[in-house]
Amino acid sequence: MPRRRYGATYDIRHYSSEKENKMHTLRSHIFVAGLLAFAVVNGNAQKPATGWTDYVGGPDSSHFSPLKQITPANVSKLDVAWTFPAGDGFYSSSPLVIDNIAYVAAKHGALVALDAATGKELWSHPFASSGGRAGISQQRGMNYWESKDRSDRRILVTTGGYLYAINALTGKDVDSFSDHGKLDLKTGIDRAPIALASRTPGRTFENLIILGSFTGEGYLAPPGDIRAFDVHTGKLVWIFHTIPRPGEMGYDSWPKDAYKYMGGVDVWGEFTIDVKRGIVYFPVASAKYELYGADRHGNNLYADSLLALDARTGKYLWHFQTVHHDVWDYDPNQAPQLATVRHNGKMVDVVALPSKNGFLYVFDRVTGKPLWPIEERPVPQSDLPGEKTSPTQPFPTVVPPFARQNMTVNDLYTGFMTPEEVVWWKERLSKAKSGLFTPPGLTETIQIPGVTGGASFFGSGADAAKGMVFVESKNVPSILKMVPDGESISTNNGGLIPSRIDAHPQPNPRAAGAASLPARLGRTIYEQTCQVCHGPDLKGDRGPALDTVVSRLGPDGVRKVIHNGRGAMPPFPSIPSQGVSDVIAFLKQPDLAPPGSAVAGNTLTEHIEPDYPANLVPKPPRYKTGYGQEGYIITPPWSTITAYNLNTGKIMWQTPYGDTPQAGPSDTLRGNVFPRSGFVILASGLVVFVDNQSKLYALDQKTGKVLFTRDAPNGAVGVPAVYEVGGREYILFALTGGPAFSAGLRMAPGGVNTPAGPKSYVAFALPVTK
């Protein structure tokens, strides 16, 4: 590939915004007396508002509030104003506040409306357990839309393969929307599976609801086409093919007819809208399978790209690909951030994209031209059979990375390890390959940032007027080793006990006839498909624990969840009935299939993935690996928040994102290992968050200095909401995180465990003065 300075293509128009809305009449008898007047933020200038109408702060995804009552001078007085119990289960949804009503996910995944001043329940909208409608507890947020005259107000949520429209005042389904209030997320997708998931609610723009999707992680996943629907009717308005069709730009960056069988290239994270210009910016994810690409030779547009489209029509404007032919799962997913900066003596509107590889890419918002040069540099090549990686990758030349991009034996953190483990890990790391763009192979590779980032969901924001962008990120390595598809994959996935993660292929498994065979086959599917989220011991990791799921839901309930998806979990329709039965056997009696007992063979391969089209000859080989997350083996900080001044391209400060007290006493913060929460930026000069160790932090926006900490009832997930009711400013957190420390991992000497408190929504505010 020739050396180039930037990779954008230009096809730009300027737009003015004028909404066109149908008027609908709804009863508002439930609306409580004394509602405050509310101005919806409709643009990227952050205008004063009293609510939080978007789960990441606004169409610009800034996490920014213009409210100034809570300041650096008084934040130490912050206290609990009210609490509302969320109920059992794992919750990851961010709240909304419109006027003085807070909307949260609670009570077994119901949509619940609360009085935002008191936390008193106004109404709830439960989701039935049948038909894939399993509740919104694990969705990352909700969407709000209103007509010009505010007579029609809707909450839009996704769950179980559907988008639902709910009356924001009454909690009733909007019967005129699509099929009696619900829209099938497969609509418009040619190669749709049984069900298609979305972990985010999309974004509203004028009379449109724009949606991404989550297609799953396997070979031959469905495509991640971007779609926009009429918010009144649910009718499909436009679609953009992220895997191009013949005649579309980027088609030649794939093998011929790749759109017929390749998948992924989805938008599973947050995206951003420049309302004034009518431009929507998407962080587009990697192609699937994301860690091996013999079936997708080429650069694979628009995978791993920042993609700008006309929000009204879906017309292509420009793109920049951050990773060519991704085999590291380095897809961007944090929301692109909008800011206005002084550059070369002129004011420039920019868009900045944090990525999982640790780089921040900054562009002119209109033209797509990089603000500073981005160079193509040679990188190591893959030695896997059939693989053809890109000879170069793009590197920003001015803006420093926000995450660590290399790890050696010298970076080994031994605080959690026994002397035996220290020796074992040093030997293991000394033999492994490393490097930011070193492809995974048949021997172990240390990848940092690992496959979960770097930058991941919920973790970026901006003070646009100051040209400041804030990025939350993780320093979590992955240790990857590819094995042929069908062989067993086993990873420590956060544990430290030496497990020798080599593959253990077993011949002809079903012929063995052992009583434990279904559970062992189920473990194999679990390790390849479920373990990254639910942990190697079923105790939960990024997802909920599954050690009691069969007794709670019953075999039929588990089968339904696997096929339909539930909350943040996508559906897995490619696993046929026998494979699902094997998984249920393992979940029911995991003692029959202890670690290392997973088996493989032709039957397993048939269980997990479909085959390629019959006319694809020769069929490419397949390799797989686990995610290999090893968060506790690298020296801290394990996560950080980084503040950039984009007027200069320099880092202003970097501060650990919370702490991990299980690592023992420390005079400095070390960050959380797997934070699941986001921060908010207050116009008064604060950055505020609750970490996964039940601690609230308030940072000085200018310096990153910790100004105040206090205990919180539980660890946080999602992005808090900042709002004002009756002249009082509140910060509402979803404190529903549960235990944050990896199950089964011993504490360091002097370490203190953080018990999980009650799952609840907690609003903090300053005391009422008399």
Q: Which residues does each predicted region cover?
A:
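Extracytoplasmic electron-transfer domains, predominantly the class I c-type cytochrome c fold
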Residues: 197, 279, 501-520, 524-527, ...
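Mature N-terminal segment immediately following signal peptide/propeptide cleavage
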Residues: 46-87, 91-97, 642-644
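Bacterial N-terminal signal peptides that target proteins for export
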Residues: 21-31
